[in-house]
Regions:
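SAM-dependent methyltransferase catalytic region
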Residues: 1-376, 380, 385, 389
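Class I S-adenosyl-L-methionine
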Residues: 391-393
């Protein structure tokens, strides 16, 4: 049962996967499980297990390579907002796989994991989408020829399964990948519109930063309705669609392992202006020195334009983190007052992990000790220590 019904369906996620270090570590853990089982098969009187092992040896020159490839294909998933990081993560898994081969004869085609390790914003996107909501978002003309959302998901999952378990580099495989991407983009467009509607229902506006020429400082922001291009820049990742088999049918991921960013979500002037001045990049720079250098840089119209555009990307996202239902535990009430107005990304990631995890799933997350004491993390602490079982600190 463990070999055939459990291990192939274990789903492990890193929602801030970076270069894939935690995914490689997860792979090694599963390898140990497989190795222990295979080591016992020859001592058991189970004809099914022995037949399985004989067939594996017939089809694959290296059983170690086969096991690693199966784990990478069926068990490991990752998302990162930086596309370059996801490419490095895939490469890292490929290198770990190839390292198990002792000769060229043991090598097989690399696993197809373009839809396992994906770029996107893990914190912004739809967790679940029901068929009715999806259909209602389409106009009548589109509805007349458009497959239902459920049909789209079923078709995509079927194609994904074919793609992931294909064993060649043939042109038809590349065509299959392109076809999956094309069909996925059609659905993503509708999901983006639904997400934009969600921002609108929350009363979130785009606050465009301005510059007061007379006072030579930032002016009052101009508020307007959020547009699709504003949303696209956030790189939304719709979990309920991209991993519908896991989120929808299995109820979430079995395990989540991650080391999310520990930083306050707000504009960082020094970080921004480092790109334009060597002085700013110096480690020992006083606040007054920085402000003086910043003032000089902002006299350049192009730099000023870039700075205002940079500032404009924060307010609507902050409002989403504060008001979205999926992040309802970010603000705590202490003595009748709201506590914890600062938005720290590790807090957002912590709650998102709970959203993505299955009912009996487990999560290993690297977070600062402040979660034990900060007033603003009261609700998160209650989730961790009262609604969950903490097995290690």
């Amino acid at each position: 049962q463990l070999l055939f019904d459990i291990l192939p369906y274990i789903s492990i996620l890193d929602p801030a996967c970076g270069s894939g270090a935690f995914l490689v570590a997860a792979m090694k853990t599963l390898i140990n499980l497989y190795s222990a089982i295979i080591g016992k098969i020859e001592f058991l009187n189970d004809i099914n297990l022995k037949t399985w092992l004989v067939e594996i040896h017939k089809k694959h020159a290296s059983i170690n390579y086969f096991i690693k490839k199966s784990i990478i294909t069926d068990n490991l998933f990752g998302v990162d907002i930086m596309e370059e990081a996801t490419e490095i993560a895939k490469l890292r898994l490929f290198l770990a796989l190839v390292a198990s081969a002792t000769s060229v004869d043991e090598l097989e085609p690399l696993p197809n994991i373009d839809f396992n390790i994906m770029p996107g914003n893990s914190l912004i996107g739809l967790l679940k989408v029901d068929n009715k909501t999806f259909e209602e978002s389409l106009d009548l003309v589109t509805q007349s020829y458009y497959h239902t959302y459920a049909e789209k998901l079923e078709e995509r999952n079927r194609l994904l399964d074919t793609y992931r378990h294909a064993s060649s580099y043939a042109d038809d495989l590349r065509a299959l990948r392109d076809n999956i991407e094309k069909k996925s983009n059609e659905v993503r467009g509708t999901l983006d519109r639904l997400l934009l509607d969600e921002f609108d229902k929350l009363g979130i506006k785009y606050e465009e930063a301005t510059w007061d020429e007379k006072k030579n400082k930032e002016g009052k922001p101009k508020k307007r309705a959020l547009r699709m291009d504003d949303l696209k820049r956030l790189k939304p990742f719709h979990w309920g669609f991209e991993f519908s088999e896991i989120i929808g049918k299995r109820g979430g991921f079995n395990a989540i392992v991650t080391n999310p960013p520990w930083e306050i979500f707000k504009p960082n002037g020094k970080e921004f202006f480092e790109e334009y001045s060597e002085l700013v990049s110096k480690k020992k720079m006083s606040i007054k020195e920085f402000e003086k250098e910043q003032g000089k840089l902002l006299k350049d119209k192009d730099i000023l334009k870039a700075w205002l555009a940079y500032l404009s990307e924060y307010p609507h996202v902050s409002e989403f983190y504060r008001n979205a239902t999926q992040y309802k535990n970010q603000i705590s009430i202490v003595n009748g007052k709201k506590a914890g107005t600062d938005i720290n990304l590790y807090k957002i990631f912590t709650e998102q992990c709970f959203n993505l995890m299955s009912k009996y799933g487990e999560c290993g997350i690297v977070i600062p000790s402040g979660i034990y004491t900060d007033l603003g993390t009261k609700r998160l602490r209650e989730i961790l220590f009262e609604e969950s079982l903490v097995t290690g600190l």
